[in-house]
Amino acid sequence: MEHEGKNNMNGMEMEKGKRELGSRKGVELTMRVLALILTMAAATVLGVAKQTKVVSIKLIPTLPPLDITTTAKASYLSAFVYNISVNAIACGYTAISIAILMISRGRRSKKLLMVVLLGDLVMVALLFSGTGAASAIGLMGLHGNKHVMWKKVCGVFGKFCHRAAPSLPLTLLAAVVFMFLVVLDAIKLP
């Protein structure tokens, strides 16, 4: 009689463990899909930001200003290109990691978990560095630099700045999601 009670208890504990494991996998999958969406959106938003405007430049005070058509694009700034590239890499990695984790549902080895953990750590570093680089250039465009006489770019290309700006918090959120994934990965390691 006592033996049956222990078996029932073990069965109930096993069922509870399976539910917790399943819910953890569900949280991980949800977070990876969120990271995929955030990185894709950040790369797209910054990649398509563009504005063309006619700018008047006065070369000599006695002559009339010269009107020049100028375009502001993310591809003209290496920090923005880096941020787009980092987001594209993170997006691709996330898609691959989702596929790998879906294929290896119940058969996740310690090696696979370690590879995913390291990949997630690399994505955290890349996304934070991309955010930092793009933020530095964005602030330079927003405020200029009086010491080297760089003018505010966002005063001239306001639409470009407003279109490019949302990519920074999206990238930052993606980095935070990857940080939580690193914590989840570390918890899963025995």
Swiss-Prot record:
InterPro entries hit by this protein: CASP/CASPL, CASP_dom, CASPL
Keywords associated with the record: Cell membrane, Membrane, Transmembrane, Transmembrane helix
Pfam families per record: CASP_dom (PF04535)
Main localization category: membrane
Membrane topology reported for the UniProt record: Multi-pass membrane protein
Transmembrane stretches, start-end: 29-49, 84-104, 112-132, 164-184
Topological region Cytoplasmic: 1-28, 105-111, 185-190
Extracellular side: 50-83, 133-163
Compartments (UniProt record): Cell membrane
GO cellular component, one term: plasma membrane
Region annotation (Disordered) ranges: 1-21
Family: Belongs to the Casparian strip membrane proteins (CASP) family.
Subunit text: Homodimer and heterodimers.
Protein name, UniProt field: CASP-like protein 1E2
